[in-house]
């Protein structure tokens, strides 16, 4: 039976296609916008049955041209939190997603889509409740508004609708994202280019490099998506993080020590890395004051309550694995 992945040439989308392939699923239609042509690299080692541009796909799917479709993984969106064109953002992230969901409901197709932790904005609590949702930008609002529609539709929906509020995802196939790529990716490139990783100094009551995020490996993101794919009776909106915040220091130390290991050098403690100038702290930029979250940590109790019980990779495990993957491909 056919499976459709939108945003298939993107970061999470291409990892999902690869994850489906590893389970023997090759009847996968990839949907994307290859205006950024270099994204095609993410699909070179994937098996797909067809490729469609996002503009052609929506109407054809609504007409039922692809026959019985088991599931749509909707990862396609504008994920640039700095985008200021609100009309574009709402059309791309909200209206397109709404039309796609309606078609899935009409056809009895599982609909699994990407929401975002940006729906929480400045909140200090990251739980899937309306009272904690305070998006700070139009990207977060586009995701928030669609989640609100989903909540209205869930009681009457006859097929699965699942939204995943991704926290800070890192891992293979994100090179094309540029400045929006993960901290791990940027730390890796910075250290290889300059021999040091620079982190923010003290800010917001947090010591140098101690501002923390819920960093999750794309490997775990794929596993959770496929868990719900296997359980079409489960619907809802779920946080998708590890449930554990880790400081940027952990990312930097793991990146540097993994690269040192590749050169046959022993690992160093954070203090030693700082002492040797391999990790440096810079003054917190004035432009970010009052606009920067110093701490995020997903509440994954709802996800666990839905039956997902696998352990998530820590930064030390996942980032090290990712750095080795980057080394294999970049030499």
UniProtKB/Swiss-Prot annotation:
Q: Which Gene3D superfamilies match?
A: NAD(P)-binding Rossmann-like Domain (3.40.50.720), UDP-galactose 4-epimerase, domain 1 (3.90.25.10)
Among InterPro entries, the record links this protein to:
Epimerase_deHydtase, Heptose_epim, NAD(P)-bd_dom_sf
User: Which keywords appear in this protein's UniProt record, sorted alphabetically?
Assistant: Carbohydrate metabolism, Isomerase, NADP
Q: What is known of its domains?
A: Contains a large N-terminal NADP-binding domain, and a smaller C-terminal substrate-binding domain.
**Which residues are listed for NADP(+) binding in this entry?**
11-12, 32-33, 39, 54, 75-79, 92, 143, 169, 177
Active-site residues per Swiss-Prot or TrEMBL entry = 139, 177
GO aspect biological process, one term: carbohydrate metabolic process
Say which family it is in. Answer: Belongs to the NAD(P)-dependent epimerase/dehydratase family. HldD subfamily.
Q: What note does UniProt attach to the cofactor annotation?
A: Binds 1 NADP(+) per subunit.
Subunit-level organization: Homopentamer.
So, what pathway does this thing act in? Nucleotide-sugar biosynthesis; ADP-L-glycero-beta-D-manno-heptose biosynthesis; ADP-L-glycero-beta-D-manno-heptose from D-glycero-beta-D-manno-heptose 7-phosphate: step 4/4
Report a single Gene Ontology molecular function. ADP-glyceromanno-heptose 6-epimerase activity
Where, by residue number, does substrate bind? Answer: 168, 179, 186, 200-203, 213, 292
SUPFAM superfamilies the UniProt entry points to: NAD(P)-binding Rossmann-fold domains (SSF51735)
Q: Which reaction does it catalyse?
A: ADP-D-glycero-beta-D-manno-heptose = ADP-L-glycero-beta-D-manno-heptose
- Name the record gives this protein: ADP-L-glycero-D-manno-heptose-6-epimerase
What HAMAP family does this protein map onto? Heptose_epimerase
User: What cofactor does this chain's UniProt record say it requires?
Assistant: NADP(+)
Q: What class of enzyme is it?
A: isomerase
Instruction: State what this protein does.
Output: Catalyzes the interconversion between ADP-D-glycero-beta-D-manno-heptose and ADP-L-glycero-beta-D-manno-heptose via an epimerization at carbon 6 of the heptose.
> Which EC number(s) are documented for this chain?
5.1.3.20
Highest taxon above the source species: Bacteria
């Amino acid at each position: 039976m056919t499976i459709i992945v939108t945003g298939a040439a993107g970061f999470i989308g291409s990892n999902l296609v690869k994850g489906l392939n590893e389970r023997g699923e090759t009847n996968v239609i990839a949907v994307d916008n290859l205006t950024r042509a270099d994204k095609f690299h993410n699909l070179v080692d994937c098996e797909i049955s067809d490729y469609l541009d996002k503009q052609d796909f929506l109407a054809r799917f609504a007409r039922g041209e692809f026959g019985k479709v088991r599931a749509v993984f909707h990862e396609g969106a504008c994920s640039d939190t700095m985008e200021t064109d609100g009309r574009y953002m709402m059309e791309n992230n909200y209206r397109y997603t709404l039309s796609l969901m309606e078609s899935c409901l009409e056809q009895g197709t599982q609909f699994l889509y990407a929401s975002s932790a940006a729906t929480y904005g400045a909140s200090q609590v990251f739980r899937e409740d309306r009272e904690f949702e305070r998006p700070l930008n139009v990207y977060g609002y586009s995701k928030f508004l669609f989640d609100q529609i989903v909540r209205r539709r869930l009681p009457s929906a006859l097929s699965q609708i699942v939204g995943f509020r991704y926290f800070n995802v890192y891992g293979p196939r994100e090179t094309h994202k540029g400045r929006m790529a993960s901290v791990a990716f940027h730390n890796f490139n910075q250290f290889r280019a300059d021999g040091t990783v620079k982190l923010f100094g003290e800010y917001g009551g947090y010591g140098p490099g101690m501002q923390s995020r819920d960093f999750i490996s794309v490997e775990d993101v794929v596993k959770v998506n496929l868990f719900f794919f296997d359980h079409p009776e489960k619907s809802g909106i779920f946080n998708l993080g590890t449930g554990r915040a880790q400081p940027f220091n952990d990312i930097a130390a793991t990146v540097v020590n993994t690269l040192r290991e590749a050169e046959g050098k022993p690992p160093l403690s954070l203090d030693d890395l700082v002492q040797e100038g391999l990790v440096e702290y810079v003054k917190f930029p004035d432009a970010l004051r009052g606009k920067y979250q110093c701490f995020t940590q997903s509440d994954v109790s709802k996800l666990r309550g839905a039956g997902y019980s696998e352990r998530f990779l820590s930064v030390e495990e996942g980032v090290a694995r990712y750095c080795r993957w980057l080394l294999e491909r970049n030499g």
